[in-house]
Amino acid sequence: SLTAKDKALVKAFFGKIAGKADAVGHEALVRMLVVYPQTKTYFAHWPDLSPSSEEVKKHGKTIMAAVKEAVGKIDDLVGGMAQLSDLHAFKMRVDPSNFKILSHNILVTCAVHFPDDFTPEVHVSFDKFLAALSSTAADKYR
């Protein structure tokens, strides 16, 4: 579970990346689609899954908007992110293992673009946060 220190580190780190969050989301999604091509099945309705695709850019922005919302609701992720869980479980029927894959790609992208801020402490706390968010997103599957 997230400690008070974890929460403080996550909030501070997200504050540093917030201005580039859309680009982080876009790159993380591109990485996921390229490195884990099986994830493309959830986006088969898009006409273009290339890195320059408008759909991919838009969804990257959507992803990071949800992460930002979760940072704001860090003290009650399950209650605060219930709609996200409902959407992915009941409407989109996304395999919950994909949340972990996306989280990993968000971490990689943050490490690449924010090396000075992505300290080992931040890495651990942000990873724990994304794991908690992934678990929350998968909550309705249980």
From Swiss-Prot:
InterPro entries: Globin, Globin-like_sf, Globin/Proto, Hemoglobin_a-typ, Hemoglobin_oxygen_transport. It comes from the Eukaryota. One of its GO terms (biological process) is hydrogen peroxide catabolic process. Heme b binds at H88. Residues 1-142 form the Globin domain. One of its GO terms (molecular function) is organic acid binding. The keyword Protein transport does not apply. It holds the Pfam family Globin. The modification N-acetylserine is found at S1. Keywords: Acetylation, Heme, Iron, Metal-binding, Oxygen transport, Transport. O2 binds at H59. The keyword Metal-binding applies. GO terms for cellular component: blood microparticle; haptoglobin-hemoglobin complex; hemoglobin complex. This fish has two hemoglobins: cathodic and anodic. The cathodic Hb and anodic Hb display small and large Bohr effects respectively. In addition, the cathodic Hb displays a reverse Bohr effect and appreciable phosphate effects. Heterotetramer of two alpha chains and two beta chains. Belongs to the globin family. Involved in oxygen transport from gills to the various peripheral tissues. This is Hemoglobin cathodic subunit alpha. It comes from Hoplosternum littorale (Hassar). The lineage of its organism: Eukaryota, Metazoa, Chordata, Craniata, Vertebrata.
